[in-house]
């Protein structure tokens, strides 16, 4: 059946399906009976896969257990089945065992033995809390009368004395305290007389028996005592005890510890136990407390009491919901001659509802019990005095109106006194009835005229009468006639609203007036116990309260526990309202609201249908069957358990008729005080403060499409905690309210998806579509995961294959190169002569030095889609940018001062880089770092080796197929270069710009350039003739022990420039350091033929040459020329820079210490990440501060850089003019160089180990004839530039010039500029939108690349870094170079580099990559085809022609991934030629979610072979064309 209107047709179908399922459950419940009802409900919930929040799930199970414990036991069942049901109701842990004499029920707290003989119960014994069994006659009577339900409820009530949810130690403490309390009460409160009940310390204690807890009677009404005395009874019997109020003492769980006494035989409480419980005082009826008394008790109680409702203390007894004006009451004395009393009560004390009806009170110490009893007696007496007036003024049922004489009395109500005013013949009088002592009132009459008491004897008489009768009207009858009060005629009874129902015993005391027949009948009637039940512990006490008057016929049934609304209480309650309280409309079920699916439910339109759909409450519950009654109560139990959904999804709505009422707990543990916001130490505020209790914060509802996108890991049915998870299950929504069906079972419950049923049962036909959809979704998710795993595996395999291919190619190239060099050493010697380079201050045109770089890290190029595939598992150094094409074994293992850290990588690269460092690089570095060289021994070895002739190996070609040998060579070379006393070669001198070196060189060139040129040419010729017979081979010989390793690995040179020269303003070119000491073995190998001069350790570097060539080191320094420059004035540089070099040496030492500290931090970073996260945060902050400091330095440098802009333009103009003549001088220059190559090669090999490469930032070549301008430029050049422009521009400015693949294989310094330009930056980068493709513009005349592009190769003579200034102010005409021999495209000219300003200086123009013979072509080559990463090519051609102006600023790209050569040593400068390209290396599949890198343009095999053979001096890949020559300027 459809019980509500929905907008969606699909929702209507589901609603019908839910109703059919619930109806099936009802039918099954009838068929199976109540024994299997809980099982049926549970199975139904599981089959429907409802998902409930954890707390609500517990509520449902608790509700089922509660129903099971309170459902009536069927009397038609067999005896064994009844006993089994009895045991089930006593707890889950009860064990039923049959023995010879009957059946026993045992649990931890109770034992019941039922004797059976001939199918009849003959005996019953019960033992509680581990005590021995005792006979239970009352229990036996119930069993014989077939009242198993009552017996079960009675035993459960006794067991509730000690809570079940506390710990075992606390439970034992409670048992001991209960025993001690009962011992004391039985001893001190055994007197059952009425006087003892009122005056004893504890009153009268009725001990606990087998069916009920102990009861403590604390007060007896005087009128009841008078009735009993008339019967001749001085002690209370059972008939009287049933009418007397009492309290029961329980223990309840608490968060605070209480003092519990320890039992002893003496009964003295000397020792106590601490337990997280508190003493609960449960009243027979709700006790009426005034706000004044509550405030006094709040100081001693550990927690707030359980309040049934907030009322007005005085108005509550009258039965009037509101009193708008003064209340008028007229007594109804029976005799006509009696003077009636007309009370006019002030309404100010009848307005506020600040008093409370308390169900349970709590104590923290049992020693406070006497004080509490005394307070209860005082409060009771005060209420009785007021109720005596109200009761005496109630008219009889058959009363008729008549005229009576009455005295007018003005009554003012207060908690401690009653103040009366009346007129007498002697004037106005006032009577004060005050409580001087607890339960002891005194009356004092005062004349308002005189202020004196008319008669003290009258006051004493009135006091005695009042304390004996507890009735103000009876006491006043003795005063009105004596004081001659003025009387008025009134009609009796007064016309005031009569209550529809008689007063309950907790509202009025009936027995003081025996003349009233109505009240006399009530005195002998048993007072019904009122039970207030909490439905669901998660609901605030005020939100769900159901009460009903207990019915004798339904006693012990389910209805007696759940209860109905008290009709009288609904009409008379004034809680939170000033007007009559009508019966409120019942709110929708909580479970139904949680199961709502439509967020657009129109509440206004459906309100009426929902109200009709709500099950009507039966008028007469006695007519209902047990099944129907249980259905109603089951709805209340289960539905209330889901009320959290309503509180969480919607605004607060009180769900029941008692929504304004706090509730009282029933016979089980109460949830706590009605107002949870009131602490125990704070007195009760007004009821208005409790209009709304603590509520859950609403949580976001699940959207309709969220379920499909739910993570597969949690499962479709898994929900988060909270209301959103409760209500929004399986595609449903929990916004809105639906009506209830007439049977109380909510038609839509949220799915219960347990661990074994995370998804709907596929065997259920109704769930097949959902299950299929879910399986399809899961299958898609698995496919996606498998695809990702496959891609990752394929990527890893390709990375491995790529590494192997690269290593094989490098190995093959080096072998071919070795063979070619062995076969034609002279040709190789002539061809590779100008491979080495020297850099001076003139190598850079910018005034910026790169900032200090952070710790060395390895790029995790895997995460960069635009990068070539990295060497993930190879040597970590392979991943460095600028790595030459060499074997992975040919790598430096000892971090030397020249090994500057590369650029910091992105966070995604961090993990990969640190792992590689820890595994290989730094661990190997630890082996040789602490070994100090033996200088004397080295000198001896060098002297001995000088006679044999030096054999120097090249840098890149020294790597062989033997990994260990290559590694040793590399170590030896690096160790030699990092020796503290080793002096770097003078030819590689790189003084800092700030030292004025450029100006000094300009002066020296202008004076001695011509003389030095001739002198050097002569010396070169001499050396060439002397060493012609034993000229050394460029490739390493098989005798590796007789030759040093490569002078310096490219990455080391790069790092040394980044560290030693790149980010210190005044740092010199000296790379000496005393902190890092290479191993002795490596020094011995590398310095076998090198002369060390220890006399000048801190000065500028000198050239170390074989001793057999020159007699002294000083002479060697003066005589060594670069192979490609015949005129140099570098000889005197060391003397000029000695003072500055010492300062540079100090700075170098500081940098070395910083580098060591950074390296140690890198080595322990992984451990820090695991051990101390806060330490990593701190380190990160320090690095941020360092980066900010560098940014500030670059910002300051930017300001100084701007001042040199004018000089740059003028200087560049002169450069272009000079570069036009370069090609003319090139042929002559080559011819001259061939004559003395061997000697220059020999000198170069000794120089290379210490070649300090310049930063090459913002590279430019100043003019030769601007000596005065050059003096000014070094000042500006030493200042670091801004992080956004100058620093970033280095990426393109310092890009390498074209170099052959053989060069990149054999050169240890050639790829230096790539690392410099791509990895030495640590600041911000400009946007990547400035990446441009090479323009289609014809390039300038072809010549060597800009100086600084290459540091030269290890097997060739050094290229003088200052040869540009060799001419005298530019007056010398340089020699003209011959044209290239092969019809192949040559490298770009330095003219082009000078013209291309900004960030692109350092890259050849687009014409270098197109066409042939240096002519511009129309075809545009992609950046990856140029040997560059994507986006690194020259900018695209503009429509108007040349893309670059002399002063044009080209912004470098933003991201490092387009600048770096991570893991791609072959991606050096562009190697595009007209020959066939070789197949490309295997590409790596990029990670998901990123774009794959563009494929590399595969160079052809013939081209690689040509490069391996050398191809001639004038080939396109020739070092002569691939390296900038400076001397012809």
Swiss-Prot record:
It is found in: Nucleus. Residues 693-702 have a biased composition (Basic residues). Residues 685-740, 807-919, 933-1529 are annotated as: Disordered. GO terms for cellular component: nucleus. Residues 1051-1061, 1068-1089, 1096-1105 have a biased composition (Polar residues). Keywords: Activator, Coiled coil, Nucleus, Transcription, Transcription regulation. Residues 894-905, 1375-1386, 1477-1500 have a biased composition (Pro residues). Residues 908-919, 1113-1130, 1137-1185, 1192-1240, 1262-1278, 1289-1304 have a biased composition (Basic and acidic residues). Signal peptide: none annotated. Residues 722-739, 807-828, 958-990, 1008-1023, 1279-1288, 1349-1365 have a biased composition (Low complexity). It comes from the Eukaryota. Belongs to the Mediator complex subunit 1 family. This is Mediator of RNA polymerase II transcription subunit 1.1. It comes from Caenorhabditis briggsae. The lineage of its organism: Eukaryota, Metazoa, Ecdysozoa, Nematoda, Chromadorea.
